[in-house]
C-alpha cells in the first residue's frame, strides 16, 4: 500500500491546480509550474483538498511519486525553494550578475554558469551564493551544478558546499 499516495494534499486558496491532457499546471503567488502527470494516476479535487487513486496495484510506486511531485509543486508556487552554498578556500569568490554566476575557485580561469529559466541566483557575500526558484528540481539541479565545479575535499575542507552540509574530514599522511 502506498502510504504517501493515500495522503491528501491541502491546496491553499491562492493556488489553482488544473489538468490539461497529460499535463498538470499549478499556479500560485510566486509563479506557475507545468509538468507531465501520469494518466494511470487520477486525482479528485474538492473542498481545497486533492485525493489520489490508481487504476491498478502495479502502479503503487507511481501513486506516491506523483502525489509527492504535486505536493512539491504546490509548495514551490506558494513559498518557493532556496539553497545556499558556501565557498571555502583562500581567494574563492563568487559574483552574480543577472542569471549568471561567476566563480573564482582556484582554477586558472573564472567559471561562469547560467541559471535555467525560473531560477534566480545571487551572491549575498563574496563567499555565499543563494539559488532560489519555484521548481524544487531546477533549484536543486543548479545548486548541484555549482557545487560540482569544486566539491569539498576531505583533507582541508576547501571547496563549494551547501550551508547545512557536513564534510567528513580525513587525517593526512603521517611522516616517517
Swiss-Prot record:
One of its GO terms (molecular function) is rRNA binding. PANTHER family: 60S/50S RIBOSOMAL PROTEIN L6/L9 (PTHR11655), LARGE RIBOSOMAL SUBUNIT PROTEIN UL6M (PTHR11655:SF14). This protein binds to the 23S rRNA, and is important in its secondary structure. It is located near the subunit interface in the base of the L7/L12 stalk, and near the tRNA binding site of the peptidyltransferase center. Part of the 50S ribosomal subunit. GO terms for cellular component: cytosolic large ribosomal subunit. This is Large ribosomal subunit protein uL6. The lineage of its organism: Bacteria, Bacillati, Bacillota, Bacilli, Lactobacillales. One of its GO terms (biological process) is cytoplasmic translation. HAMAP family: Ribosomal_uL6_B (MF_01365_B). Transmembrane segments: none annotated. The keyword RNA-binding applies. The keyword Transit peptide does not apply. InterPro entries: Ribosomal_uL6-like (IPR000702), Ribosomal_uL6-like_a/b-dom_sf (IPR036789), Ribosomal_uL6_a/b-dom (IPR020040), Ribosomal_uL6_bac-type (IPR019906), Ribosomal_uL6_CS (IPR002358). Keywords: Ribonucleoprotein, Ribosomal protein, RNA-binding, rRNA-binding. Belongs to the universal ribosomal protein uL6 family.
Amino acid at each position: 500500500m502506498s502510504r504517501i499516495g493515500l495522503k491528501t494534499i491541502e491546496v491553499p486558496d491562492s493556488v489553482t491546480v488544473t489538468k490539461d491532457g497529460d499535463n498538470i499546471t499549478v499556479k500560485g503567488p510566486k509563479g506557475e509550474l507545468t509538468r507531465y502527470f501520469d494518466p494511470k494516476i487520477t486525482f479528485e479535487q474538492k473542498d481545497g483538498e486533492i485525493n489520489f487513486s490508481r487504476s491498478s496495484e502495479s502502479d503503487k510506486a507511481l501513486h506516491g511519486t506523483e502525489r509527492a511531485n504535486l505536493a512539491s509543486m504546490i509548495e514551490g508556487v506558494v513559498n518557493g525553494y532556496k539553497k545556499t552554498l558556501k565557498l571555502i578556500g583562500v581567494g574563492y569568490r563568487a559574483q552574480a550578475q543577472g542569471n549568471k554566476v561567476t566563480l573564482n575557485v582556484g582554477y586558472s580561469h573564472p567559471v561562469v554558469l547560467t541559471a535555467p529559466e525560473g531560477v534566480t541566483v545571487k551572491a549575498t557575500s563574496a563567499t555565499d551564493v543563494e539559488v532560489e526558484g519555484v521548481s524544487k528540481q531546477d533549484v536543486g539541479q543548479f545548486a548541484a551544478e555549482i557545487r560540482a565545479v569544486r566539491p569539498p575535499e576531505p583533507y582541508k575542507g576547501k571547496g563549494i558546499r551547501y550551508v547545512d552540509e557536513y564534510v567528513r574530514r580525513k587525517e593526512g599522511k603521517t611522516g616517517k
